[in-house]
């Protein structure tokens, strides 16, 4: 055994091999895969990829959450090289950029990506492509035939790059965050101090697997604690599915918890019933939930555990303990990290900085950005303004970032964010960055109240551009559901 992940795979195969583990909806019902079947497929798919020459290569995974994604993620990370997750909702330009940036040699893709994949194949004819629907089972079978037996492959070292996660920057192209297996497994003990999860628990997995929290804390840590996972379908089916599978663990963003709250009031059905009737642990990240909604869950005995972290900290920084009544905090600092507040003001607020096994290896092929992300004492600079009191973490907002244009003009990202937010009441968050000479924004909106007509958005941005300086005019914008607003 050369890494902690392989150790858990071996233990799980012995302890839980015959147990149902992953459930994915096929037609109208959830179909199970056992721990043994999953771990065997991981080994044989890794065998196939190594046989095809992908050792220590970057391999992309593109599509919605699926069991094939999970098999690929673990196989690549543990035995092959560096897995790179692509968001299923990315635009063609974002996928092209990410393929080039991460230097992938192979792309595992879902046929549901349709037209974008047709264009990608033409743009990158030299990549190896593996279709989830058409090729994946055959690849596993080929690996099985070539294998000398289960667990005969050598696991990769725990301290080398194993995972690339793209995180949206506020002033530039998305950065490619490099994580090792040791990074990925740095937080399970802190999570275990907060929850008593085990084989009797069920996680309803909604968060996308290309994000660190969904991938690490919902999926990968199931290999530590042994709980079952049901893959969520569409948002509109969530309540129906939860009432059918009765989960005990669920992680979401404020938009989802707000929708359940509103549905509960409108239908006159208790929140606990909508969430399946036996929910134990709710985790909320991405932004703070309002005290009113958080209290509504608490009144039914479901305590919302706020979580705060970044991709660069392997989604580990702070998580509430169950029953926490401090509505303003974003969680209790992990016990296994060294965090501090830099240059605090009179109220104790400054930039949050952190050291620990959770802190990433660096940005892929970007030494300058990596160097800028740390101070002279080796602390990672989060860019978030906050404070820590009695091990509770509080966030005030992002540190204002200055954007330097190609003509040398210096403008405030925060000022632009605030002005864009004023354009429409449905806007919940804005990210500002440069692409070439264009000032770009990702505009995260509440789906229920956001304009559906692209022409209306175009008109709103045109009106904004008329009243700002020529240096602050938006050159390109993307309208994105706030359900995608994860770090």
Q: Model features per residue range: what roles?
A:
Residues 32-36, 162-188:
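Conserved AMP-binding A3 loop
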Residues 332-333, 345-373, 392, 407-411:
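Conserved ATP/PPi-binding loop(s) of AMP-dependent carboxylate-activating enzymes
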Residues 185-202, 209-278:
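Conserved AMP-binding/adenylation subdomain of ANL enzymes
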Residues 21-53, 60-66, 70, 74, ...:
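Conserved AMP-binding/adenylate-forming core of the ANL superfamily
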